[in-house]
């Protein structure tokens, strides 16, 4: 799970950020605009460490803290860039993820065009899209220190 995957497009952005306009960078994550935006604003927040999918997250303080930090970064970006919009945050779950590198979708709604909302629906037990807050509840450590 740790480190960088040489074949991963998001790991390439982490290694060589000059190819992408970064909206945020810190020791844990980077953020940039989705190349195929589905909303008025559509940003991605990714960990610098290669974590393939939400299924690789566990009820551990470090995983919970990472996702909470990703959400905080996304919220700050959208509050700054689209404060009047409704915001939505979440992750695709396998097999519906397009890139095998954990990434938080951050939306300032509405979806553009409107039909793109279909891509970001929960499919219940089949997976689909999971809201960031729902994922946080799912991975919250049982004896949380955070």
From Swiss-Prot:
One of its GO terms (cellular component) is peroxisome. Residues 9-120 form the HIT domain. GO terms for molecular function: adenylylsulfatase activity; nucleotide binding; sulfate adenylyltransferase (ADP) activity. The keyword Ligase does not apply. InterPro entries: Histidine_triad_HIT (IPR001310), HIT-like (IPR011146), HIT-like_sf (IPR036265). SUPFAM superfamilies: HIT-like. It is found in: Peroxisome. A motif (Histidine triad motif) lies at residues 101-105. Its EC number is 2.7.7.5, 3.6.2.1. One of its GO terms (biological process) is purine ribonucleotide metabolic process. The keyword Coiled coil does not apply. Gene3D superfamilies: HIT-like. Possesses adenylylsulfatase activity in vitro, releasing AMP and sulfate from adenylyl sulfate. Also possesses adenosine 5'-phosphosulfate (APS) phosphorylase activity in vitro. Catalyzes the phosphorolysis of APS, leading to ADP and sulfate. PANTHER family: ADENOSINE 5'-MONOPHOSPHORAMIDASE HINT3, APRATAXIN-RELATED. This is Bifunctional adenosine 5'-phosphosulfate phosphorylase/adenylylsulfatase HINT4. It comes from Arabidopsis thaliana.
């Amino acid at each position: 799970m740790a480190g960088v995957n040489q074949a991963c497009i998001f790991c390439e952005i982490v290694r060589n950020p000059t190819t992408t306009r970064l909206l945020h960078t810190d020791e844990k994550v980077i953020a940039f605009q989705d190349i195929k935006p589905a909303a008025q604003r559509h940003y991605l927040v990714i960990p610098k460490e290669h974590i393939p999918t939400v299924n690789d997250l566990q009820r551990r303080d470090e995983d919970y803290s990472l996702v909470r930090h990703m959400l905080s970064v996304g919220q700050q970006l959208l509050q700054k860039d689209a404060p009047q919009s409704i915001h939505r945050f979440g992750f695709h779950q396998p097999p519906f993820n397009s890139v095998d590198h954990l990434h938080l979708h951050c939306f300032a709604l509405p979806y553009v065009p409107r039909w793109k909302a279909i891509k970001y629906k929960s499919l219940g037990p089949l997976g689909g899209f999971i809201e960031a807050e729902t994922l946080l509840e799912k991975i919250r450590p049982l004896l949380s220190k955070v």
